[in-house]
Amino acid sequence: MTLLVGLGNPTLRYAHTRHNVGFDILDSLVSGLNLSFTFSPKHNAHLCIYKDFILLKPQTYMNLSGESVLSTKNFYKPKELLIVHDDLDLPLGVVKFKNGGGNGGHNGLKSIDALCSNAYYRLRVGISKGTNATEHVLSKFNENEEPLKNAVFEHAKNALKFFIECNDFNAMCNHFTLKKPLAIET
């Protein structure tokens, strides 16, 4: 079993902000599979179980994401963990994968690292850097960024679908890494 976590903040206030990339991509994946999330008070998260995967959206706010992840890990005992999250250090349009390593200052990852360890897979979605990091991650994508954002979200969703089918992180990395921003037709 694999635990697949999309990071974000709950409530409409934060819906579709840069920090909610993980939520939005998992929502798109679940919707595309004609499934839905249900709220689990036990794990304080929205859950969806599909094949050998537990899809999770913590409802703890970003800085406490590790609480939901730890609770879910302890209950289901997954062999692998993959986190989908925004990354300020990557330009919008870039998707990279990582196995373990540092958290890059991402508070959701810091929480998971502190409670669970940093030995997990990551799907990193570039959101670019802003002048003020806090304001930037909590802002919505602007109108000019929307086409690229939508294309990148679709690409990331397809990467996760591929991972669910083959359960091979390295194969997903080889097929779906975007080192340069995705080129889209306008």
UniProtKB/Swiss-Prot annotation:
Gene Ontology biological process terms in this record: protein quality control for misfolded or incompletely synthesized proteins; rescue of stalled ribosome
UniProt site (Discriminates between blocked and unblocked aminoacyl-tRNA): N9
Database matches in Pfam families: Pept_tRNA_hydro
Annotated positions for site Stabilizes the basic form of H active site to accept a proton: D86
Primary subcellular site in the record, as a coarse category: cytoplasm
Binding positions (tRNA): Y14, Y61, N63, N107
Top-level enzyme category: hydrolase
GO cellular component, one term: cytoplasm
Record-annotated active site: H19 (proton acceptor)
Cysteines joined through disulfide linkages: none
Keyword Mitochondrion: no
GO function term, MF aspect, one: tRNA binding
Keywords: Cytoplasm, Hydrolase, RNA-binding, tRNA-binding
Catalytic activity, EC: 3.1.1.29
Location in the cell: Cytoplasm
Reactions accelerated catalytically: an N-acyl-L-alpha-aminoacyl-tRNA + H2O = an N-acyl-L-amino acid + a tRNA + H(+)
Job of this protein: Hydrolyzes ribosome-free peptidyl-tRNAs (with 1 or more amino acids incorporated), which drop off the ribosome during protein synthesis, or as a result of ribosome stalling. Catalyzes the release of premature peptidyl moieties from peptidyl-tRNA molecules trapped in stalled 50S ribosomal subunits, and thus maintains levels of free tRNAs and 50S ribosomes.
Family: Belongs to the PTH family.
The protein's assembly and partners: Monomer.
Protein name from the UniProt record: Peptidyl-tRNA hydrolase
Record organism: Helicobacter acinonychis (strain Sheeba)
Gene responsible for this protein: pth
